[in-house]
């Protein structure tokens, strides 16, 4: 019974993780973002934006 509980718990955790990852539309790499913005003589950072039911991780140059 305890093994069944552990299996169900892991299944729920993995499913939740997949749902969260499935709603992230774009990923931002901080080092790539800084390099991209450095060419424009600006500072770059990754920001998180929410639009509808999706999450966007974008690079923003300031």
Curated annotation (Swiss-Prot):
The organism's place on the tree of life at top rank: Eukaryota
Functional summary from the UniProt entry: May block potassium channels.
Similarity comment: Belongs to the short scorpion toxin superfamily. Potassium channel inhibitor family. Alpha-KTx 23 subfamily.
Gene Ontology terms: cellular component: extracellular region
UniProtKB keywords: Disulfide bond, Ion channel impairing toxin, Neurotoxin, Potassium channel impairing toxin, Secreted, Signal, Toxin
Organism ancestry: Eukaryota, Metazoa, Ecdysozoa, Arthropoda, Chelicerata
Disulfide bonds: 28-46, 33-59, 37-61
Cell compartments where the protein resides: Secreted
Annotated signal peptide: 1-18
Tissue-level expression: Expressed by the venom gland.
Annotated source species: Buthus israelis
Protein name as it appears in the record: Potassium channel toxin alpha-KTx Tx308
MF GO annotations: potassium channel regulator activity; toxin activity
Domain remarks: Has the structural arrangement of an alpha-helix connected to antiparallel beta-sheets by disulfide bonds (CS-alpha/beta).
């Amino acid at each position: 019974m305890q093994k069944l509980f552990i299996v169900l718990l892991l299944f729920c955790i993995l499913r939740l993780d997949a749902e969260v990852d499935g709603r992230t539309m774009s990923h931002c790499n901080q080092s790539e973002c800084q390099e991209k913005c450095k060419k424009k003589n600006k500072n770059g950072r990754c920001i998180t934006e929410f639009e509808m039911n999706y999450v966007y991780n974008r690079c923003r140059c300031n």
